Curated annotation (Swiss-Prot):
Top-level taxon in the UniProt lineage: Eukaryota
One of the record's GO cellular component terms: cytosol
InterPro entries with a match to the protein in the record: YPEH2ZP
Family to which this protein belongs: Belongs to the FAM72 family.
PANTHER family: PROTEIN FAM72A-RELATED
Name the UniProt record assigns to this protein: Protein FAM72C
Length: 149
């Protein structure tokens, strides 16, 4: 994959929250489409959500490709809000993708644009650190600031 063809650096970063209970699930979300069916909108992230979700049920495979998936539920309300691509198939890995393997169902989450350090501009994926140290307190502070806006 060439980064010139598949660049996601200008995409907005979102805070993702559970629609059912408003629990903050991720502060590194990005709007995406399902590779196997581009009519399906969703959100994705590159880092697993912590202290907000957990695996549920058994692994399964899609009908369109051979990716191995597992559902993930919100710890606060128990609703399935995410699935994790545990083993991506070669077809999906070779296609233009963002290397995100945590996929949030658009009907189960809502997004809030995350602001950059100035608090004025929307944070873009290209300006997001590859790995962020976050604690529950950090996520709650982000959520409170964004909810007030």
């Amino acid at each position: 994959m060439s980064t010139n063809i598949c660049s996601f650096k200008d995409r907005c970063v979102s805070i993702l929250c559970c629609k059912f209970c408003k629990q903050v699930l991720s502060s590194r979300g990005m709007k995406a489409v399902l590779l196997a069916d581009t009519e399906i909108d969703l959100f994705s992230t590159d880092i697993p959500p912590t202290n907000a979700v957990d695996f549920t049920g058994r692994c399964y495979f899609t009908k369109i490709c051979k990716c191995k998936l597992k559902d993930i539920a919100c710890l606060k309300c128990g609703n399935i809000v995410v699935y994790h691509v545990i083993v991506p198939c070669s077809s999906c890995l070779l296609s233009c993708n963002n290397r995100h393997f945590w996929m949030f169902h658009s009907q189960a989450v809502y997004d809030i644009n995350r602001l950059d350090s100035t608090g004025v501009n929307v944070l873009l994926r290209g300006n997001l650190p590859e790995i962020e140290e976050s604690t529950d307190e950090d996520v709650l502070n982000i959520s409170a600031e964004e909810c007030i806006r």
